[in-house]
Amino acid sequence: MVKFALQFKASLENLTQLRPHGEDFRWFLKLKCGNCGEVSDKWQYITLMDSVPLKGGRGSASMVQRCKLCSRENSIDILAASLHPYNAEDSETFKTIVEFECRGLEPIDFQPQAGFAAEGAETGTPFHEINLQEKDWTDYDEKAKESVGIYEVEHRFTKC
């Protein structure tokens, strides 16, 4: 079992507390089999709500799958306690926002999509359903009378 951290980096304009919103947030990942090196050609998603039992009664995971090439059963689990918001003071630096516990799988790519939420840095104005698929997002904070945005989104995986 290996833990991988998803580190996130972005430039935040007048925003803080950027985070995945809700237990149904979809983490879209590309995964590699640790046994044979096969990489999934399609994006796969996992959520905190997903729970699949592991063989042999060893607990559960967010996703269990059998490798198409070598037939090995692999799993990945979201570690709920590792979820952290990306704040204004984190802007333009890499910060771990979630960790995954992997058995036989390695996450190699992440595709941010809809489902993020944030707050206005000065006003606390909530912004929901932020879509980061284009790596940029903008809106307007009526209370502060200023633009808000998320720019230059980057990510990387590191072993914990």
UniProtKB/Swiss-Prot annotation:
The keyword Metal-binding applies. Zn(2+) binds at C33, C36, C67, C70. Disulfide bonds: none annotated. GO terms for molecular function: zinc ion binding. Keywords: Metal-binding, Zinc. It comes from the Eukaryota. InterPro entries: CXXC_Zn-binding_euk. Pfam families: CXXC_Zn-b_euk (PF05907). Belongs to the UPF0587 family. PANTHER family: CXXC MOTIF CONTAINING ZINC BINDING PROTEIN (PTHR12857:SF0). The N-terminal and the C-terminal half of the protein have a very similar 3D-structure, suggesting they arose from duplication. Requires a bound zinc ion for normal folding and solubility. This is CXXC motif containing zinc binding protein.
